[in-house]
Amino acid sequence: MQCPSCQNTDSRVLESRSADSGRSVRRRRECLNCDFRFTTYERVETTPINVLKRSGAKELFNRSKIINGLNRACEKTLIHGSKIEFIVDEIELELHQGVCKEIKSIEIGEMVLTHLKDINEVAYIRFASVYRQFNGINDFMKTLEALKPIKKEQLASVI
């Protein structure tokens, strides 16, 4: 591993531990040339997933796009960084466990909405309004009406 301070390639590992719920390894290293200490993360390299956009274009899966969308949808709610990372980790895990290595962006959006529905209704509506390209209040009303039966069922199961 190349030292960020002196670019020497000789270092020793001082400490290793699991990170990201076991999906990566965090290593604390020390450069053998300048004694600079730095941290590295190792992650299993997975098969790339292609995303088929609405326009028909293809691009590689980019988790930061989901994180950015969730950050906007969850702004001023109680959902913050670690929960957003968890949602994206779960979606990415589902994608990598799937047989197909190409997925439509619409399917990814639905996966995000499935997670948000259980966590925060406001974030769900915000994400849905952008993802489903709402054109007016009727689109909001339809989505809100679709959420109502779910809440009634949850209340009935508690009673």
Swiss-Prot record:
Cofactor(s) listed: Zn(2+)
Free-text comment on the cofactor: Binds 1 zinc ion.
Any GO BP: negative regulation of DNA-templated transcription
Keyword Zinc annotated: yes
Record-linked InterPro entries: ATP-cone_dom, NrdR-like_N, RNR_NrdR-like
Chain positions covered by the region annotation Disordered: 1-20
Role of this protein: Negatively regulates transcription of bacterial ribonucleotide reductase nrd genes and operons by binding to NrdR-boxes.
Protein name (database record): Transcriptional repressor NrdR
